[in-house]
Amino acid sequence: MQPHLSHQPCWSLPSPSVREAASMYGTAVAIFLVILVAALQGSEPPESPFPYHIPLDPEGTLELSWNVSYDQEIIHFQLQVQGPRAGVLFGMSDRGEMENADLVMLWTDGDRTYFADAWSDQKGQIHLDTHQDYQLLQAQRVSNSLSLLFKRPFVTCDPKDYVIEDDTVHLVYGILEEPFQSLEAINTSGLHTGLQQVQLLKPEVSTPAMPADVQTMDIRAPDVLIPSTETTYWCYITELPLHFPRHHIIMYEAIVTEGNEALVHHMEVFQCTNESEAFPMFNGPCDSKMKPDRLNYCRHVLAAWALGAKAFYYPEEAGVPLGSSGSSRFLRLEVHYHNPRNIQGRRDSSGIRLHYTASLRPNEAGIMELGLVYTPLMAIPPQETTFVLTGYCTDRCTQMALPKSGIRIFASQLHTHLTGRKVITVLARDGQQREVVNRDNHYSPHFQEIRMLKNAVTVHQGDVLITSCTYNTENRTMATVGGFGILEEMCVNYVHYYPKTELELCKSAVDDGFLQKYFHIVNRFGNEEVCTCPQASVPQQFASVPWNSFNRDMLKALYNYAPISVHCNKTSAVRFPGNWNLQPLPNITSAVEEPDPRCPIRQTRGPAGPFVVITHGGRH
Amino acid sequence: MQPHLSHQPCWSLPSPSVREAASMYGTAVAIFLVILVAALQGSEPPESPFPYHIPLDPEGTLELSWNVSYDQEIIHFQLQVQGPRAGVLFGMSDRGEMENADLVMLWTDGDRTYFADAWSDQKGQIHLDTHQDYQLLQAQRVSNSLSLLFKRPFVTCDPKDYVIEDDTVHLVYGILEEPFQSLEAINTSGLHTGLQQVQLLKPEVSTPAMPADVQTMDIRAPDVLIPSTETTYWCYITELPLHFPRHHIIMYEAIVTEGNEALVHHMEVFQCTNESEAFPMFNGPCDSKMKPDRLNYCRHVLAAWALGAKAFYYPEEAGVPLGSSGSSRFLRLEVHYHNPRNIQGRRDSSGIRLHYTASLRPNEAGIMELGLVYTPLMAIPPQETTFVLTGYCTDRCTQMALPKSGIRIFASQLHTHLTGRKVITVLARDGQQREVVNRDNHYSPHFQEIRMLKNAVTVHQGDVLITSCTYNTENRTMATVGGFGILEEMCVNYVHYYPKTELELCKSAVDDGFLQKYFHIVNRFGNEEVCTCPQASVPQQFASVPWNSFNRDMLKALYNYAPISVHCNKTSAVRFPGNWNLQPLPNITSAVEEPDPRCPIRQTRGPAGPFVVITHGGRH
């Protein structure tokens, strides 16, 4: 793609402030290329080749579109900015902070407008990158909006640049309302800024053809008045028609009410348990005191969508059963509204459209839970920045419960509660890690979607599936124990696979006898009191541990050593036959081999300074 | 510096094999620059601007010279290769391995000779670097030898390149005896290779002027027949004249017998203890059964030199006392001969020349021992790759023992036994790490020298000095305990400082009562037998620990938590007054801030492929 040159292209020397910024890096930047003069009016941009779009801010001032070239390992971004602005910043950071961020900057000194690859330090101060890896291809002003087209390799090997991987990316943005004399004069703390989570590197999965008899069913909340609070989880119960026969869901997609694109953050459809005949109707906030407790039994995920996700197509050889006597007719829709500006009076009927067919596919797709059992035996001390808990699906369980031909995992949804920061599931065979099933090094509990895997993973009998979650409890004063509560923690990977088996749950937790040995040592070693009396519950015991470094390190040592209790279950209550207690931890001797990052060849890059993009002319 | 162009410069296209190698990296390398045609005879190279020289191999086939520009953060290397060779490789790796090394390659396909920045993978297979960071400046053939001049930045930010720091660097070399059709066809395992340890980044310390009355004294072994075994430590006892009055040593330097430069690896001069009137004379291998035990009391380092080191100048305000009634007249010289090719019949009189003066300087320089007490309480489990032990010089000790104005540390010698891999001493004040006193991330017990610090460090009353050593016990089957034996371990930093104080030793070890609690837990938790009977020694207790992950992790947790016994001593046997047992570990809340690596700007680099250096002409 060539830079789009408008009328009046010209060459220009940089202003003193820019020369200064560039010389800080020891470069004598000789010539700056003015690639566009402002106010190109009346010409529409060419039709968009960008399959993915998201609003960056709740007002819809900034909209991002992008496409991905896996061959070239490059992303093209198109950023559209509404209204007259002095400039904009866009970029990525570990968890959405404005500090230590990898940025592209468009700013003006009042005279000229510049584009540059930059970064922010730990105080939010902005600096020019040594390597200009974001490459501007086009800058276009249309009436009252500005459109920037630029590209960047996934990996730049510049230590100041974010490494774009296929997990969650925390995009950051900021709006500059006034000129700055130089890039170094800008600090992100003084700007109107925000973040948006997205998966940038969507997998390239071929789209199976839809059969002729495909039908659709919209699961949507009817005309909700979006509350003017930052976070609302809205719950709505609906039901399938009576005697609805067996179908296969083969695709689903989001339907978002026009104008609310920046407010609807993510949505999920759950099927209720089959153990109850009927569920009460409900339409209101999920945390409402009026919400019937029974709705907690509607937890079986049927569909999940999050901002930026496109339609979800099941592999052509599998479908998800919908209807029939064996499953509940009741469905729960949950919509997460994210309204940080407390916008009032907005009405919404967003939801999910299921595409289903009566022509059943050869395989039924199932969902299996991997990770940790929901139990307080697994706990995280307070004030930890990166504490890891691991759950195992052991070789003995896959040997017993999987078919000889194995299963294929094609999608995955990672799940923790509020302190989760990373999740990974790895497949191991014969004591060696073989491949990553799914991984998110920038996991956010506020951004949960079902992700198609780039490569489906086949799990054979005797394989081990290891799911690890990393937690940050810096802001907690007490230990965080495992459990269902929002202030308790989970570590789960819901894997979507076929053919469906009886195995619904393959998880583990530390053996409780060994945990009691831990509490005993804590007691003896520290000469301090940890309640080990018979009536103390495990959460009470954890609450009385003095969290010195020895007790923290010893808890990690325990979890890395002690035998486990394995839940190799048909349903949450029914285990496969056998004794699953005091199982040894899988002995894994080698880690997954990670390919080296491929640094791009830098032969074609531009000069190591900011580009002048727009010259306003006059005013010197 | 400009490339030296000889007669017949010409442009040439690469041979097919090279084109292949380059295209593997996706580069279309258009043009290769032939910068030298072979066999430039009769012209001497210009006078060498290189202050540092070392032989790379024991035969003296390869000799390296270098200089350092701290301003530009660049090293210039000159590599001289004797005899007709098909090529040579030179580079750096973590600990001298030929795998995962950062290399420059000079090789021929029989027709042309090429130069390239390359790297070896974990199997020793050689690949072209994406970034060509070694830049060839001159290649010159003089009669039967080849001289290469090239430069490289300290830090390249290419993940395949070694980061050159001011610690030990393990240089690697290899000689190519035959042509290879391409770079990728070369594997280091098939070559004649070796390693050499050196400090590349010597500090830029100004050289104080020598006074008029300076005298010299040579401490050298008389006409030693170098044994034809790989490793010999040669011991030689000599003495100062009777009634030798007080002087100050102000400089020392190595005197290496000509022709033995590649065999003399390092040398040290020790002063014997003053507690004995006389020591027996001795001249022989240090491990000889004939060596008198008394010589073990000659341990006070006066001078130390290792390969590549230049003369050692004391700061002009300090000198090391030599002579007088308060110190022993007896000196021990230790010479380490490294003779891996078992060369026979070589005679040697190498040693150290002390430069001393009767005009005493304002301050006496002293040596203080930091790190761990020599005690089995501090132990390393077997089969550990990176186990860290830490010794503390506490605020209470520096408060009591240092003068109000503090002391200045100007040099440091790090010391461990065979399993030591890294050593660092950090200064902390008010609970925060402030600066690194000395650090070697590529420490080798076989390369011990006294190093001048780039910046002298002032230690005030109340400061804490933390010395950590990292050990590798992969090849051990039993725990390695602290102690004097060569198979036991030490963690010591001998710091050279002024003004001299009474504090000779400021070290620590874990409290023995807490270690006994550890053995007790090991016993209870594992239901296994660890001997805790009264007659068991600590080494016996460590020998009976079953080294599962829990007991390993818990030992680390103990050393990071348990109180310590501090040795704040005037001499090894005399403590400063007070109770130094059960002291709390210093509470350090922040680490030393490390500056970001400065990646070089790559604007001026050459094409991303190998250079053709020499065209032999004809033969197609």
Curated annotation (Swiss-Prot), chains A, B:
The active site lies at 233, 415
Entry's Gene Ontology cellular component terms: apical part of cell; axon; chromaffin granule lumen; chromaffin granule membrane; dendrite; extracellular space; neuronal cell body; secretory granule lumen
Residues bearing carbohydrate? 67, 187, 274, 475, 569, 587
Cross-referenced InterPro entries: Cu2_ascorb_mOase-like_C, Cu2_ascorb_mOase_CS-1, Cu2_ascorb_mOase_N, Cu2_ascorb_mOase_N_sf, Cu2_monoox_C, DBH-like, DOH_DOMON, DOMON_domain
- For this protein, what is the EC number? 1.14.17.1
Chief localization class?
membrane
Q: Which residues bind Cu(2+) A?
A: 265-266, 336
One Pfam entry name: DOMON
Record-linked PROSITE patterns: CU2_MONOOXYGENASE_1 (PS00084), DOMON (PS50836)
DOMON domain: from which residue to which, for each copy? 60-176
State the Gene Ontology terms under molecular function: copper ion binding; dopamine beta-monooxygenase activity; L-ascorbic acid binding
Disulfide bond entries: 157-599, 235-286, 272-298, 393-506, 397-568, 469-491
Residues the record lists as Phosphoserine modifications: 349
Could you list the residue ranges that cross the membrane?
20-40
Residues the UniProt record annotates as site (Cleavage) = 42-43
Which top-level group of life is the source organism from?
Eukaryota
Record note on cofactor: Binds 2 copper ions per subunit.
Membrane topology term reads: Single-pass type II membrane protein
Name a single GO biological process: maternal behavior
UniProt keyword terms in alphabetical order = Catecholamine biosynthesis, Copper, Cytoplasmic vesicle, Disulfide bond, Glycoprotein, Membrane, Metal-binding, Monooxygenase, Oxidoreductase, Phosphoprotein, Secreted, Signal-anchor, Transmembrane, Transmembrane helix, Vitamin C
Per the UniProt topology annotation, the Cytoplasmic ranges are 1-19
Modification comment: Proteolytic cleavage after the membrane-anchor leads to the release of the soluble form.
Q: Its quaternary structure?
A: Homotetramer; composed of two disulfide-linked dimers.
UniProt lists the family membership as follows: Belongs to the copper type II ascorbate-dependent monooxygenase family.
What's this protein's function?
Catalyzes the hydroxylation of dopamine to noradrenaline (also known as norepinephrine), and is thus vital for regulation of these neurotransmitters.
| Protein name as it appears in the record | Dopamine beta-hydroxylase
Q: Which species expresses this protein natively?
A: Rattus norvegicus
Q: Its gene?
A: Dbh
